[in-house]
Amino acid sequence: MGHFYLIRHGVTEWNAENRMCGRSDIPLSEAGRRQAEVLAERLKLIPLEAVYSSPLKRALQTARLISELIGLQPILDERLVELDYGEWEGKLLADILRNDPATYRAWDADPAQLAPPGGESGLAAQQRIVSFLDSLAGRHPQGHVLVVSHKTVCRLAICHVLGMSPSEYRRRLILSNAALSIIQSQPWGWQLMTFNDTSHLSEVGPGAGEPELGFRESAPSP
């Protein structure tokens, strides 16, 4: 069976500001680099045979800080890029809620079928993510592989693994920056072994991970 370690990138300034960050090529903050460094220490003894990464800077920086310790080069895959937030890209969530609350609430209630204005739906994103997972399982039927990506990508991957509706990913799955999730492939399908493990972040102090705000009353972070 193959073991796949799904990593959400370290924190960025936009994450800390609760700003919609999809395809913008935002780097890690200093706190995010430290998160990636302590995560690398945790993972360095795992016999990884490959590291895959989104080409976006925040994910690639995270992947490189880990792969430097194990002597591997990240393999870039466009299917791992974050959801396209369209017209909301770069905007503060508070501003979107103030200026277009009806559109945001409709999307938030069913982010699989609906897309941000000019952006990508959860179903469209999940199709490329499932394609990546299928190719990954075929390429690495045994062994250990690291995958560094983004919040929505990882949550939609977990929805697929669990057979859960992608419409539920924002409502039911909380995923912090630099969190570790582990899935494994079996002949009969996928298993979730670990989800949103941030125990390694205790080394960088409280508040290192991005907060996840409550659903509905105060909208979830992007």
Describe the function of each predicted region:
Residues 12, 153-154:
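Short active-site segment of divalent metal-dependent hydrolases/proteases
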Residues 65, 156-160:
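Active-site signature of alpha/beta-hydrolase-fold catalytic machinery across serine-
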Residues 38-104, 221:
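Phosphate-coordination/substrate-recognition cap region in phosphate-metabolizing enzymes
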Residues 103-124, 221:
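Short glycine/proline- and acidic residue-enriched helix-loop micro-motifs
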Residues 5-66, 115-130:
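Loop-to-helix element that buttresses phosphate recognition and phosphoryl-transfer chemistry
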Residues 2, 72, 86-97, 138, ...:
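Acidic, low-complexity terminal tails and accessory targeting/binding regions
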Residues 45-49, 138-145:
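Surface-exposed helix-capping loop/turn segments at secondary-structure junctions
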Residues 150:
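Short basic (Lys/Arg) and small-residue
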